[in-house]
């Protein structure tokens, strides 16, 4: 719609389309907070003139280059936009804890080679980062059960080296 990869909301019937983000860069992977008042998402933001040129050139061809992504949170109408991670590398697949006070997400920020990806938790204000998984491959797409007693995630662990990705469900205790 805008020529950039922005976030929008709309009614289930497709009416009442509203643009939520309006900053150059790739915005995606959005989820609403349990009460519907906030949106958490991943985004890349080209900073230098060279990065802007590369981003817009690829976008004109319908492409996006894998790049650093950070997590952003805003009100469900797009107001009060804040970046909550400043970790570098790829921080993505965010999901709200049922309390609405914390976010689980996947990141490779501790990696120098691009892997592994592990699951982390952070407060919605960007404080109290905590590592949740300690895998050596790929742990991602974390989601909580509605009652907060289980965490499901995808992982390449225990796959016998064949690159299969499986779903794991873990009991969760706050």
Annotate each language-model stretch with its function.
Residues 117, 128, 138-140, 147-151:
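A short pocket-lining beta-strand/turn micro-motif at the edge of beta-sheets
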Residues 1-6, 21-26, 42-70, 83-91, ...:
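A flexible loop/linker signature enriched in serine peptidases of the S9 family
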Residues 39, 103-104, 151:
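Hydrophobic beta-strand positions that form the internal "hydrophobic ladder"
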Residues 88-90, 99, 124:
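Active/binding-pocket-proximal capping segment
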Residues 10, 18, 31, 42-43, ...:
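A structural signal for the main folded, soluble domain(s) of proteins
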Residues 11-15, 75-79, 123-127, 172-174:
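Short loop/turn segments that connect beta-strands within beta-propeller blades
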Residues 34-35, 98-99, 146-147:
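Residue-level detector of Asp-centered blade-edge/turn motifs that repeat once per structural unit
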């Amino acid at each position: 719609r805008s020529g950039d990869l922005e976030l929008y909301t709309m009614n289930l019937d497709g009416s009442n389309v509203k643009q939520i983000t309006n900053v150059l860069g790739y915005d995606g992977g959005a989820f609403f907070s349990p009460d519907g008042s906030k949106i958490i998402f991943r985004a890349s933001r080209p900073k230098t003139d060279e990065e802007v040129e590369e981003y817009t050139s690829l976008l004109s061809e319908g492409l996006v280059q894998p790049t650093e992504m950070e997590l952003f949170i805003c009100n469900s109408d797009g107001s009060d936009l804040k970046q909550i991670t400043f970790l570098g590398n790829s921080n993505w697949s965010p999901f709200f804890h049922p309390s609405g006070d914390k976010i689980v997400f996947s990141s490779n920020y501790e990696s120098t080679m691009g892997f592994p990806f592990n699951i982390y938790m952070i407060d919605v204000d960007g404080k109290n980062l905590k590592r949740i998984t300690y895998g050596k491959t790929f742990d991602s797409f974390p989601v909580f059960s509605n009652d907060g007693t289980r965490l499901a995630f995808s992982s390449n662990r225990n796959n016998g080296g064949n690159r299969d990705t499986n779903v794991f469900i873990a009991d969760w205790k706050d």
